Design a protein with these regions (language model features):
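Lumenal/extracellular ectodomains and adaptor appendage modules
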Residues: 1-88, 355-401
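Short, conserved helix/loop micro-motifs enriched in His/Cys and acidic residues
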Residues: 235-256
């Protein structure tokens, strides 16, 4: 619709600079190499090609973003996977908008804060006000490349983040946008695709009677039986999520995200009298949760925290095909996960070392008088090692693998 909030990129310009016969030659981008690509119902990508780019070429581009989303300013990343000779970021904030401004990264940015006067359009009114103009400059910034030993390179990228703290218009009450983690807990618990899933009845209640859980001795045995039963019903589609679709749809399709399956698992465990809760997090390859302020936008998935006794917690996630208690995929073994529980009982947990991972081999052998060594080797796989072995066995073409 015409009155919908939107965001546009304007003033795009780009050039390539090459050294030819001792002279710097500039080649400007033409408009016919700029095009749009739709990537969703409400999102488009603007793509462009810079001409005459080759090894040693210096490229330069600039653009301006006009956005109606005043409450959400994208992070500005000063570094890239190529060296940056010079980069600059400007933002002007009207006095009525209060932002938390966070800078982090190893490289230094030059910053300048100046008073500014500007005209602010509010509906049909034009309001003249003061504000602050922020200028950030980076010079000679090294390339920041992915590394096999680093989960998320963006965690180390020199960048500027702005998050709206509140709005204070004259004649109006101050409106706060700052949230505590307790408020985020409440928001999630009220969400129809999150909190409502925690209240749903077990959709596999009748079928689960075939497990005869009442004959099992310990909670661990019951948990594993329920988990295995569910995994035989629904296959993980290799997608991680925070919110879920209808459990009826998930069971009908026989596949779903880890969130889709985890919510069903929680309902089954509760039905068996075993307390279970979602432990929300940011995946390790999606960046760490900010320490400076709570952020629901940074949450992107969860695992299931299970309390078989009042004093213990164990963890499961439906993305693990051949796992066991406390065997999580490494991408979910974060140092900050938040267990979402009602009545203000939420808590932070560290999932980096939730279970023992051990590979132990012992060899019993003897040497005959002819110098021939014979014997046996016994190998014990525990935790992640056991899960990997089961996966390898399950996907092997034949016994020789």
């Amino acid at each position: 619709p015409n009155n919908a909030m939107k965001e546009n990129i304007i003033g795009l310009d780009a050039s390539a600079y090459n050294l030819e016969n001792g002279k710097i030659v500039r080649t400007k981008m033409k408009r016919d190499v700029v095009f749009k690509e739709r990537v969703g119902e409400s999102r488009m990508n603007l793509k462009f090609s810079i001409p005459q780019v080759k090894a040693g070429t210096l490229i330069e581009y600039e653009y301006r973003i006009e956005s109606d989303f005043f409450f959400s300013i994208d992070s500005w990343k000063a570094q890239s996977d190529i060296p940056i000779l010079y980069t600059e970021y400007n933002v002007t904030i009207p006095e009525y908008f209060k932002f938390n401004i966070e800078m982090h990264g190893a490289e230094k940015l030059e910053t300048v804060n100046e008073n500014a006067s500007l005209n602010l359009s509010i509906g049909s009114q034009l309001l003249r006000c003061s504000g602050t103009h922020l200028n950030f400059q980076g010079n000679q910034l090294p390339a920041l490349k992915d590394d096999s030993h680093v989960w998320c390179a963006d965690d180390y990228c020199t960048q500027v983040n702005l998050e709206l703290q509140g709005i204070d218009f004259p004649g109006s009450l101050y409106k706060s946008f700052t949230q505590s983690w307790e408020q985020i807990d409440e928001t999630l618990l009220k969400d129809s695709d999150f909190g409502s899933r925690l209240k749903m009845n077990n959709p596999l209640k009748e079928e689960m009677t075939a497990l005869h859980l009442e004959q099992m001795k310990g909670a661990d045995e019951k948990i594993c039986a329920i988990y295995t039963f569910l995994k035989n019903k629904v296959r993980w589609n290799e997608k991680y999520a925070l919110y879920s679709k209808s459990p009826k749809q998930v069971l009908k399709e026989g596949t779903g995200s880890n969130a889709d399956i985890n919510f069903i698992l929680i309902s089954m465990l509760k039905d068996a009298g075993i307390p279970a809760y979602p432990a929300v997090m940011s995946r390790r390859d999606m960046g760490i949760l900010p320490y400076s302020h709570p952020s629901i936008q940074k949450l992107n998935t969860f695992v299931v925290a299970i309390s078989p006794t009042d004093s213990t917690l164990v963890y499961l996630d439906s993305s693990v095909e051949n796992g066991y208690l406390n065997v999580l995929p490494p991408v979910l073994m974060t140092n900050r996960a938040r267990i979402i529980a009602p009545d203000n009982h939420s808590q932070w947990v560290n999932l980096e070392n939730v279970g023992a991972n051990l590979l132990r081999s012992s060899v019993k052998a003897g040497i005959s008088s002819e110098g021939v060594v014979t014997g046996t080797r016994e190998t014990v796989y525990i935790g992640q090692y056991a899960s990997r072995l089961r996966n390898k066995y399950r996907t092997a073409k034949d016994s020789t693998e």
